Amino acid sequence: EQPCASAEELVEVRRQLMRNGLFVRVAADESIRKVEDPYRVADLQAADVAVVKPAPLGGVRRVLEVAQHLRERHMDITVASALDTSIGINMGLAAVAALPQIYDDEDIDVTPAAAGLATGSLFEEDVTAPRRLHDGHLRAEILAPEPDRLSSLAAPANRRDWWFERLRESW
């Protein structure tokens, strides 16, 4: 996980770790998700692993673009969710499935990591039946919202209107 706020601070963390003989892989999360330039982390060699989240980055295609750039700079990719429901996790599963296989220096298959996609279990309720982990894995099945669950979990009209207004203002 990212231990500090900026890419520059990550560079310093890596420098201090190496200086002290500690070979610990550093992951960048917020420095990719919350900045205008998600490539800066790689350009500065600030991390070993990039945690990419489809929703904040703008979808599966954007994840694939960012992942390609970062991999070309020798960063490993981990796909995670941003506290998504089962519907949002569909996008994370699609992103992992779409990432190309890579091979390490010894021509060994390296499977893209999918960590942090089981965030649906953090919700009391969801708009689908709960996704279940099977031996530490999520099934790559596309879940659709269930009408009864959508109805029972719908926000009150005033809250819905507030969200629509917020979207209009930000658009």
Please state what every model-predicted region is.
Residues 82-171:
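Flexible C-terminal active-site loop/helix
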